[in-house]
Amino acid sequence: MILIDKIVFGKYTIVVRNKREDIAMLIQFSVSNFLSFNEQETFSMIAGKARKNIDRVFSNKKIKLTKCEVILGANASGKSNLVSAFQFAQSVIVDGLPRGFSNKFFRLNPENKTVPSEFEIELLCCSKIF
């Protein structure tokens, strides 16, 4: 498991100690109206109810999360665009909105030009869900 020492959100920094209860982990990431994503799509790290391989699951009193996920899919199914959405959201948090961001909407629906792109990030940090 990778332990994060600090998380930077623009001018805010969360320092995380390397204790089990102070681990920072992604819970889920959602995106809509961005590149090939028209409707909201969610990448989730929430663990299922399987009882096998429990060493691959991080759990505390609030939630159970998988420690690792794999993105699989056919060619042109949106894998690279999901990674681009992660990178875009990160750059907005750290650096603010970049120039030219308005042309990244889902172009197959002409109405989406006036609809905002949406990103939702849910994190577990210091035993709290943000």
Enumerate the predicted regions with their spans.
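Conserved P-loop NTP-binding catalytic core
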Residues: 64, 69-70, 74, 83-130
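Pre-Walker A-like glycine/lysine-rich segment at the N-terminus of P-loop NTPase domains
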Residues: 17-87
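Short, positively charged and aromatic/hydrophobic N-terminal segments
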Residues: 1-2, 6, 11-17, 21
